[in-house]
A protein has these predicted regions:
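N-terminal beta-alpha lobe that positions the nucleotide/phosphoryl donor
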Residues: 1-186, 195, 284-292, 300, ...
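Long, charged amphipathic helices and adjacent flexible linkers at domain junctions
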Residues: 68, 79-82, 103, 175-176, ...
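Conserved alpha/beta-domain cores
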Residues: 115-118, 125-135, 140, 180-184, ...
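Extended active-site and interfacial segments that coordinate phosphate-rich ligands
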Residues: 136-169, 193-269, 328-360, 404-411, ...
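Conserved metal-phosphate-binding beta-hairpin within the catalytic cores
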Residues: 137, 309-334
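Conserved catalytic alpha/beta cores of large enzymes that bind or transform nucleotide phosphates
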Residues: 213-313, 318, 357-365, 391, ...
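Acidic, glycine-rich flexible loop/linker segments
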Residues: 321, 335-337, 357-360, 365-388, ...
Length: 798
């Protein structure tokens, strides 16, 4: 028996040749990590020896070799027929008596109470789930198998799945000899996730490869809906360093629609063992996991990653009967762990065209090609290499087809769907979950698939002009004396940008989060009942329906956005500027018009620090402070600093500091908290010593400082030609600000485009002794080059 089946408690990674990657990993976790609290369902596995004995007893080795020799290895025109014949040979065969008896004995020992308890029966090939052989899903698994008769049938079906079309093609593509691959079958106690939830996890951020995140996603019911991409799952981002410190480590939660719930078919005679049902409305607006459960899974993920010594791809499930969480599979992550994250290619579309469809962007590339609408993988011969697959949804059966595609577009699916996983592995762009791509895209027309514009992917009509920039940051040295920092606004770009050479974030714009993630005016949330427009109220209700108070929605979303950026650059400084909309910009937020005055010149009106203590906005400023307090104190991201914009007078600075104290941001109670002020008004420069008595540092805002020094309205096209940061008056103010700040013992930096565009301006700043310069990401490399040259010249001139 021992040679034909092995209990999980007796299996380790070293047994991979006998039980395959999947079962070796399950056994390793069960035997080695259970003592650390990682819960893995018990089970056993048939061995490779059992598989060979099955083939030999039925004299199948030679017939299978002969079948594979008949395969058309150029065009694969007879792949379907060959695969079907091979599977029939195995399904028509019988299990040797000693193997069948061993399986039945192992099954009964798992429970001991009944012969009808449910198990999962999973295939595990001896070359599956290895980093160099990464396509999972080549072989079949069978869930909710009850009784010895059904179990033995499922084992034969697993054996037959070694010859699915996709498995045969995969072995051909990877140079594996068909007659050298054995199949082990894992038999594992079922987790009743059909009564609860299930999902997947990565011990890195799956889009960028950022290593300090545990990314979890989950759906109601069985996890197949995530793999198939038929529903939009909940997503959770957990930050490893603060998790280890027992802080509130969930930095971001995204509520998915979870439209369907997959459960076991109530009809025992149904052709399908599972059925998809519509999720109840109340379940769709509820997260599948509580915060404690999210952190428990994340801690297990850390234990698993530490044990294996590499990033891991994990499957989890919650038992609806016991309420317990389980890890049901773990394999090495195979995409980002194989890449150098410091080699980055960025794309920019110079002129956008007509948008045909949008969805979730997978990757950051752009591809142009002929659209080929394919209802199923059986029409693979229609696709020519370099064309773009447009379909409803993909599954592992699509793998041979997708390898020829320049890009993938699907109407269904999410970031963890099959199409997304394959796109990452193949390194091609994909736009998933479009909803209307098949309707709007014509078969045979040329399209451009763009994933370079953030989380949203676009499909444009025609061939667009694309600019490609290749960076290798592996050996790029930062300046020696002047910090090179980034300007960041979009949390969705933060993890990718963390691989750029940087000394932190010199300006985090809060406005992007409010506009794109929150969308509503904070006062409209606080005084929702005052709103008279029914359409606006309905839109706000749709955004906030799963929060008990609408103000909590603002605080939570803002805190998550800030925390994501702070985590991406942790422990480097992330200087968060409090909201700096102008009144016309605030008015454009949902409900904003009811709370904003109409101003002739908003650029010089009710903006910046003046709002924070004013009765029109002070309640909203409290929400901003609560978000900062949550990020620093509860989440433990103490690298977050605060910056006050457009502070006109020293007295106004005192009022803002007092307002922050009243709202819980008190430097006496939190000595690590630093508060900076923008130096963008001449009064900030002329009275820099007095401002330095209130604030911990300055950041020169060259745009507003130029506007106010030269009396130029930045929004006026007529006088825009006079706008010049290098005007002597502006440079004198900048030089004065740097000298006065340093004299007062305060740090000072500058945010803006000019140091990257004009080497002589960078030279001026370095000569003045500025502490840091912050750049937009696309200007960072040029900016670093200019700073380094300026530092070299400054040293030579001394």
């Amino acid at each position: 028996m021992k040679n034909l089946i092995r209990k999980f408690s007796d299996i380790h990674l070293t047994d991979l040749p006998q039980v395959g990657g999947k079962n070796a990993s399950l056994g390793e976790m069960f035997s080695e990590l259970s003592a650390q609290g990682v819960r893995v369902p018990d089970g056993f596995a048939t061995t490779a020896l059992a598989f060979w004995e099955f083939l030999d007893t039925n004299r199948l080795r030679q017939p299978l070799i002969e079948l594979m020799n008949q395969l058309d290895k150029n065009q694969f025109t007879n792949l379907g027929a060959i695969g079907e014949k091979a599977r029939k040979l195995i399904l028509d065969a019988h299990l040797p008596d000693n193997l069948a008896h061993s399986i039945i004995k192992g099954y009964r020992e798992l429970d001991g109470m009944t012969d009808q308890f449910a198990v999962a029966v999973r295939s595990s090939a001896t070359a599956e789930d290895l980093p160099q052989a990464s396509f999972a899903g080549q072989h079949e698994s069978y869930l909710n198998i009850r009784g010895t008769e059904q179990l033995l049938i499922a084992v034969r079906k697993c054996y037959a799945s070694l010859y699915t079309d996709r498995a045969i093609k995969y072995r051909e593509d990877n140079g594996f000899a068909h007659d050298r691959i054995a199949l082990s079958v894992g038999v594992q106690k079922m987790v009743r996730s059909d009564l609860a939830c299930s999902g997947v996890g990565f011990t890195l951020e799956p889009e960028s490869g950022f290593r300090d995140i545990v990314h979890l996603s989950g759906v109601w019911g069985l996890g197949e809906n995530i793999v198939q991409g038929t529903v939009t799952p909940d997503e959770f981002f957990v930050f490893k360093p603060t998790l280890r410190k027992n802080k509130k480590a969930i930095i971001q939660k995204k509520l998915g629609e979870k439209e369907k719930t997959m459960v076991y078919s109530p009809d025992a005679h149904s052709k399908s063992a599972v059925v998809n049902t519509s999720s109840p409305p109340d379940k769709r607006v509820q997260f599948v996991l509580g915060d404690d459960e999210i952190e428990q899974l994340a801690r297990w993920a850390l234990i698993i990653e530490a044990h294996y010594g590499k990033p891991m791809d994990i499957e989890w499930a919650k038992d609806g009967e016991s309420g317990e969480l389980f890890i049901v599979q773990a394999r090495p992550e195979t995409v980002h762990s194989q890449r150098n994250p410091y080699r980055i290619t960025s794309y920019k579309i110079n002129k956008k065209g007509i948008t045909l469809a949008t969805g979730q962007a997978i990757g950051n590339k752009v591809a142009t090609g002929v659209a080929r609408l394919l209802p199923s993988p059986k029409e693979a011969d229609k696709l020519k290499p370099g064309e773009i697959v447009v379909t409803s949804i993909t599954s592992p059966d699509w793998d041979p087809v997708l390898k020829k595609a320049a890009a993938i577009v699907t109407d269904k699916g999410g970031r963890t769907s099959h199409a997304s996983i394959v796109a990452r592995e193949l390194g091609v762009p994909a736009v998933v979950g479009c909803g209307n791509a098949l309707q709007n895209i014509r078969d045979g027309e040329t399209i451009t698939v763009s994933c370079c514009e953030g989380k949203t992917g676009y499909i444009y009509r025609g061939k667009l002009e694309v600019q490609q920039l290749d960076y290798d940051f592996s050996d790029l040295q930062k300046p020696e004396h002047t910090k090179a920092m980034l300007i960041v606004g979009d949390p969705d770009q933060a993890f990718k940008l963390s691989f750029y050479p940087n000394d932190g974030v010199g300006l985090m714009r809060m406005e992007f989060i409010i506009t794109h993630f929150i969308q509503a005016h904070p006062m409209a949330l606080i005084k929702f009942d005052r709103l008279k427009d029914d359409k606006t109220k309905a839109q706000i209700e749709a955004l906030t329906h799963h929060y008990p108070k609408k103000e909590l929605y603002f605080v939570d979303k803002l805190a998550q956005g800030i925390a994501t950026i702070a985590a991406a650059f942790y422990p480097k400084d992330v200087i968060v500027r409090m909201s700096d909309f102008k009144t016309n910009e605030y008015a454009n937020l949902l409900g904003g018009k009811a709370f904003e005055p109409a101003e002739e010149n908003p650029m010089l009106g009710f903006r910046g620090a003046s709002r924070y203590y004013h009765e029109r906005y002070q309640q909203a400023f409290k929400l901003e402070c609560e978000a900062i307090k949550s990020v620093r104190n509860e989440m433990g991201l103490t690298n977050v600093k605060v910056m006050i914009p457009f502070c006109r007078t020293v007295e106004e600075g005192r009022k803002v500091i007092d307002a922050m104290k009243a709202n819980g941001l008190d430097r006496d109670l939190d000595p690590g908290l630093e508060i900076y002020v923008m130096a963008e008004i001449p009064s900030n420069v002329l009275l820099a010593e007095a401002f330095a008595g209130l604030f911990d540092g300055f950041s020169i805002g060259s745009n507003d400082l130029t506007q106010l020094a030269l009396g130029i309205d930045r929004d006026s096209a007529i006088v825009s030609s006079l706008f010049n940061e290098q005007n002597d008056a502006v440079k004198q103010l900048i030089g004065m600000a740097i000298r006065k700040a340093h004299h007062a013992g305060a740090k000072i930096g500058l945010c803006g485009q000019a140091p990257s565009d004009f080497p002589e301006f960078a030279q001026f700043l370095v000569q003045q002794g500025i502490d840091s310069i912050s750049f937009n990401p696309d200007a960072l490399v040029k900016g670093i080059e200019n700073i380094k040259k300026a530092e070299e010249r400054t040293i030579l001139s001394v």
